[in-house]
Every structure is written in structure tokens, then in C-alpha cells.
């Protein structure tokens, strides 16, 4: 992964728009589209064509657009202006303390946490749509009392429409990132201001509904976006432990690349950039 704060047209905007138009040209989609969600292998707000892409999607589809962002670039006026075209913006704020923020998110050195919080707060004041602040918690990393107190103060400053609490997936593939229980998240939710919801999934899938993973369908899925092993298991209804083992085998064989982002291991095609 490249750690940077430099905005560029990393992929030609025209190519992205052409792919969107190709998708919209299919009248009978497998699933009707309710909302277009813009995310990225890296960070959407680093792309200088973001505003144009959002506006194009809305004009062509008539559907609302949500943008997932790590929030690191929201101190910039140009980024805040481009995000105005969206309907929902979901920035991450996994910690409001510099020490635990660095540990869980491993941000680029150019990212300033105070600037980031101030930028998200300013955007909330200017934005007519919805802002949902997502917080990813990991046990003994960013869930301690001083972390929650700092987070509480930041939320009061930001004033988002929602706060969404999540935790790392179970079983975690990284030794240092352990999940919180539902009880842990409920306790923390009770300490935070505003409209707080727990979005972490603790449901267990029925074992007899699981399928064995097939490399072909997984590689096809990864052509669309990077995924974690639990993402793949959930989306394709695959047995989780077998899926994790297969992904490790595919990585060892060079058929997929591994990358770590926000404490989670993602897989992508080897030719992705």
C-alpha cells in the first residue's frame, strides 16, 4: 500500500465513468440498485475526479450516492466541496487519541488527527445530507476508558447524524487485532452521545448452508474489489475456516496479494494497483 496525502487522478476519471455507464446499460441487474457506494482500495477522497464521479452517478442513475472515507483528507476545503454532491458520507474515526489512532489505523505520516476531526466537524456543519461516523474498535487497542472519553468529546464536536460501532471480524487473521463482544460494544455505545448503533454482525450462519470455496469464483469477486476472507465467506456463503485456508494458499501461490488496512487482511489480484 502507498501511504500518501497527495490528491491525483490515480485512475482516469473517464475510465471510471465509462465503467459506471456500462453497468447502468444493463437493464436487468441481478439486484436492483438502491444506493451507489463509492469506496476504494485506498481512499476515494485522494482522487481528484471524485466530485465529477458522484455527480455523474446521480445524474445518470437518479439514485443516492454514499461515500466511504477514512476522513483523513476532510480538512481540505476542496475535498469537503466535492463531497457536498453526495447524499451520505461515512467517515471513519477509530480513535480520537493520537497513540491508539496510529496503532489501529497505521495512517500516513502526513495525516494529522486533530485536523482530521476538525475537518469532519466542519463538513457536518456545511453538509445537507447524512453523515454517519463509523468507529472500528479492537480489544485493548482503542477501547480503553481514555479512548472512549476522547471519542465522546470528538463526537460532540463533530455532531454526526449517526455513530456506527463496529469491531474487527471474528476470527481475526491478525494476532494484534481482537474483536470486542456485543456486550462490550453495548457498554461503549451507552457512554457515547447522539444516535449510536452497533453494526457489527455476531450472527452465526447455519453450518449446513455453507458451501466449499472454489478459487474461480473468489478470484472473479476480487476483480471487483479487495476483500477479506470473512467478506468472501459471507458474500459467497462459504465455510469460513476453509475460505481462510484457501486464501492463504492462493497468496502463497502468488494468485492473490495480501495487504493490511485498518488492522484487517485484504486480498486482491496480483495485477491490481
List each model region and its residues:
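Canonical Radical SAM [4Fe-4S] cluster-binding loop centered on the CxxxCxxC motif
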Residues: 1-14
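Short Fe-S-cluster ligation motifs
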Residues: 15-41
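Well-ordered alpha-helical segments embedded in enzymatic catalytic cores
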Residues: 15, 19-22, 115, 119, ...
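Alpha-helix C-cap/termination motif
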Residues: 26, 30, 60, 126, ...
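Hydrophobic helix-cap positions at the C-terminus of alpha-helices
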Residues: 23-27, 57, 123, 250
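Auxiliary Fe-S-binding modules of radical SAM enzymes
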Residues: 143-273
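Conserved AdoMet/S-adenosylmethionine-binding subsite of the radical SAM
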Residues: 45-187
Amino acid at each position: 500500500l502507498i501511504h500518501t496525502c497527495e490528491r491525483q487522478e490515480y485512475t482516469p476519471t473517464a475510465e471510471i465513468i465509462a465503467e459506471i455507464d456500462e453497468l447502468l446499460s444493463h437493464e436487468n441487474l441481478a439486484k436492483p440498485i438502491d444506493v451507489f457506494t463509492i469506496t476504494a482500495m485506498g481512499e476515494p477522497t485522494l482522487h481528484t475526479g471524485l466530485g465529477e464521479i458522484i455527480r455523474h452517478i446521480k445524474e445518470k442513475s437518479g439514485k443516492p450516492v454514499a461515500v466511504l472515507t477514512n476522513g483523513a483528507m476532510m480538512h481540505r476545503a476542496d475535498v469537503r466541496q466535492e463531497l457536498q454532491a453526495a447524499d451520505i458520507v461515512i467517515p471513519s474515526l477509530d480513535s480520537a487519541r493520537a497513540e491508539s489512532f496510529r496503532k489501529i489505523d497505521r495512517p500516513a505520516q502526513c495525516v494529522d488527527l486533530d485536523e482530521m476531526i476538525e475537518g469532519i466537524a466542519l463538513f457536518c456543519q456545511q453538509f445537507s445530507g447524512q453523515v454517519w461516523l463509523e468507529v472500528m474498535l479492537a480489544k485493548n487497542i482503542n477501547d480503553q476508558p481514555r479512548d472512549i472519553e476522547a471519542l465522546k468529546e470528538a463526537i460532540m464536536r463533530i455532531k454526526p447524524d449517526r455513530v456506527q460501532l463496529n469491531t474487527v471480524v471474528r476470527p481475526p487473521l491478525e494476532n494484534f487485532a481482537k474483536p470486542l463482544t456485543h456486550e462490550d460494544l453495548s457498554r461503549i455505545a451507552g457512554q457515547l452521545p447522539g444516535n449510536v448503533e452497533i453494526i457489527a454482525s455476531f450472527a452465526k450462519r447455519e453450518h449446513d448452508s455453507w458451501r466449499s470455496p472454489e478459487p474461480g469464483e473468489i478470484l472473479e469477486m476480487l476483480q471487483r474489489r479487495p476483500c477479506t476472507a470473512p467478506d468472501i465467506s459471507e458474500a459467497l456463503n462459504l465455510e469460513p475456516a476453509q475460505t481462510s485456508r484457501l486464501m492463504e494458499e492462493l497468496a502463497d501461490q502468488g494468485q492473490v496479494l495480501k495487504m493490511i488496512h485498518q488492522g484487517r487482511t485484504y486480498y486482491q489480484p496480483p495485477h491490481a494497483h
